[in-house]
Amino acid sequence: MNVADETLIKWANTHLPDNLQITDPTGPLCGGLGLLRLAESIKGRPSSPPVPDSAFPTDPNDDKLDGLFRLFDFLLDNDVKMGSVSINDVRQGKRDKILQLLRALKAWEDKRRALANTIARGSIPTNAGFMLPVVIS
């Protein structure tokens, strides 16, 4: 495991509830439930309607897929750039794909913070007393 991945896992744990913390950085990372709770934490509110923990598979052979579909809907609806990660990748706990999603969620959080900072700066008057325009693309 490299330093960047360790840093990413520490970051993820700041968003995850105690029962979903990643405790062994070399073992399984997190499943769909952890990824959804992480995304909800970044957004600052739960998905609507709420997704119960029981909607997620507990192992790769579990057929509960509703939670995973809701996770991917949430990520797509919020424009999280997931790349080539599939529901099956998450269901099977593929480490490289979970890390890819964690990176995507971190990038999404960074983008949200940058946008919030831009909006905040746009409301501060300049020396001439004019308001700075805010352009959101």
Predicted regions and their residues:
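Alpha-helical coiled-coil scaffolding segments
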Residues: M1-S137
